[in-house]
Regions:
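Residues that flank catalytic or metal-binding motifs in active/ligand-binding sites
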Residues: 28, 42, 74, 79, ...
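Acidic, metal-coordinating catalytic segment for phosphate/diphosphate chemistry
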Residues: 11-52
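Active-site-adjacent beta-strand/loop module that shapes the phosphate/pyrophosphate-binding cleft
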Residues: 26-33, 52, 118-142
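Short secondary-structure junctions
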Residues: 6-21, 108-114
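Conserved Nudix-box catalytic region and its N-terminal flanking loop in Nudix hydrolases
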Residues: 38-40, 47, 52-95, 151
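Nudix hydrolase/Nudix homology domain
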Residues: 2-3, 7-8, 72-75, 85, ...
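Short amphipathic beta-strand/extended segments with alternating polar/hydrophobic composition
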Residues: 36-40, 115, 162
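The catalytic Nudix box helix
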Residues: 77-115, 130
């Protein structure tokens, strides 16, 4: 059975034109092979680890979709954002960290790639996850300006002491996943 999956290759060309059901600013919905598929941008997600201070950087974020369901204004999430046209994951990562966390990472900083993962079965988007162990020489701090949106203006980066990792209460599965990865990373390094 595994041989079947190891030989899978991405579609090289469209056999037929995809039917667009909806097209919006951030995503579209297409019909393909009897499925409704959400077509959107890939995104970077990360947790910076500030080594000297034993802290991680998270986001206390205003997320309208979560508020719609829970009524709660703010949620604990990750530094994250879409990979824009012309960007590779590392470029998008450094831009998002500056916009959302106010950290300017030195250009020659080497990031370790983790395996990109699909967001859901119904979406073409992939998350490119990163854990960034940073020494003070790897970055300098600036004021996080966000992307100009209302949600960004109502959100902020927060530094969390590593000793409180087990008491954090994330609202989404990808934040939970990344916190588990950070704990795994820290246990390997201790």
């Amino acid at each position: 059975m595994m041989d079947k999956f190891s030989k899978m290759k991405p579609r090289k060309e469209k056999e037929e034109a995809d039917e667009t059901v909806f097209s919006g600013e951030h995503f579209s919905i297409i019909k393909y092979d009897d499925w409704s598929i959400i077509k959107g941008s890939d995104a970077v997600i990360c947790i910076p680890i500030l080594i000297e201070t034993n802290q991680i950087i998270m986001r206390y974020e205003y997320i309208p979709t979560f508020k719609y369901v829970t009524g709660q204004d703010h949620h604990l999430t990750l530094v994250a954002g879409s990979i824009e046209k012309g960007e590779d994951p590392k470029t998008a990562l450094f831009r998002e960290i500056e916009e959302e966390a106010g950290l300017v990472i030195r250009e020659d900083y080497e990031v370790e790639d983790m395996k990109p993962l699909f967001c859901t079965k119904g979406s073409t988007s992939k998350y490119y996850p990163f854990i960034l162990p940073l020494n003070e020489r790897d970055y300098h701090e600036v004021i996080a300006k966000g992307d100009g949106s209302k949600a960004e203006a109502l959100s902020k980066a927060v530094k969390v002491d590593i000793k409180f990792l087990d008491s954090l209460n994330p609202s989404d599965i990808i934040t939970e996943y990344m916190l588990l990865k950070v704990k795994e990373y820290l246990n390997l390094k201790l």
